[in-house]
UniProtKB/Swiss-Prot annotation:
Keywords: ATP-binding, Cytoplasm, Glutamine amidotransferase, Hydrolase, Ligase, Nucleotide-binding, Purine biosynthesis. Residues 3-233 form the Glutamine amidotransferase type-1 domain. Part of the FGAM synthase complex composed of 1 PurL, 1 PurQ and 2 PurS subunits. This is Phosphoribosylformylglycinamidine synthase subunit PurQ. Its EC number is 6.3.5.3, 3.5.1.2. GO terms for cellular component: cytoplasm. The lineage of its organism: Bacteria, Pseudomonadati, Pseudomonadota, Alphaproteobacteria, Hyphomicrobiales. The gene is purQ.
């Protein structure tokens, strides 16, 4: 799997993401600066990592979404290329029009930084084939604006089309207000576009891929992408 990690001013999770990709795929990802106008030839996966691009001024991800490299990312996605946005990367994908909705301030107006449980809603997508449907995984979050919101029609469409891939839940898989850490509509933690090749999620799977971290639940996302691309080759 040949991956490319986008680097914007203020991003601070690009090295975490690059390490996870390298450990799981066995290949060193390319680091692509925001001012670039093209992606490396042969790229299979583009990742927008977490952090605080441009200091989160205006709106989280709003300035990064207008960076030169994003035209190449939109074209890549339009051609069916796989795109993953994590945390600030999710915000960037929403601001760039690659995903619907927006990420608002957490309901309790506080920064959240701890492990959470997610329920995997489907296992038949490139981003979830490393898991079983209904499986509960544990991954970290670190955000102040992770409260996913969209109009009622968009939420209805996301649910009806099976485009919610990850949902906040309890350790046993229960979904509800008690386990909804940030107030996100329908406890949404991660969604895909209509075509299913662009995923945005607030939690950080890249931080749970090694035994030394005490949990490897995030590894399945990356292993699933590798398996999907190998099968498609």
């Amino acid at each position: 799997m040949k991956s490319a990690v986008l680097v914007f001013p203020g991003i601070n999770r690009e090295r975490d993401m690059a390490r996870a990709l390298r450990l799981v795929s066995g290949r060193e990802p390319a680091m692509v600066w925001h001012a670039e106008t093209s992606l490396p030839e042969g790229t299979d996966l583009v990742v927008a990592p977490g952090g605080f691009s441009y200091g989160d001024y205006l709106r989280c991800g709003a300035i990064a979404a207008r960076a030169p490299v994003m035209d190449a990312v939109r074209a890549f996605a339009s051609d069916g290329g796989l795109v993953l946005g994590v945390c600030n990367g999710f915000q960037i994908l929403c601001e760039s029009g690659l995903l619907p909705g927006i990420l608002m301030r957490n309901a309790r107006l506080k920064f959240i930084c701890h492990d959470v449980h997610l329920r995997v809603e489907r296992s038949d997508t490139p981003f979830t084939r490393g898991y079983n449907a209904g499986q509960v995984i544990r991954v970290p979050v670190a955000h102040g604006e992770g409260n996913y919101a969209a109009d009622e029609d968009t939420i209805r469409r996301l649910e009806g089309e099976g485009r919610v891939l990850y949902r906040y839940c309890s350790a046993s898989g229960e979904v509800g207000d008690t386990h909804n850490i940030n107030g996100a509509a329908q406890s949404i933690a991660g969604i895909v576009n209509e075509r299913g090749n662009v995923l945005g999620m607030m939690p950080h799977p890249e931080n749970h891929v090694e035994d030394i971290m005490g949990c490897t639940d995030g590894r399945g996302l990356f292993a699933g992408l590798v398996a999907h691309l190998e099968r498609a080759a």
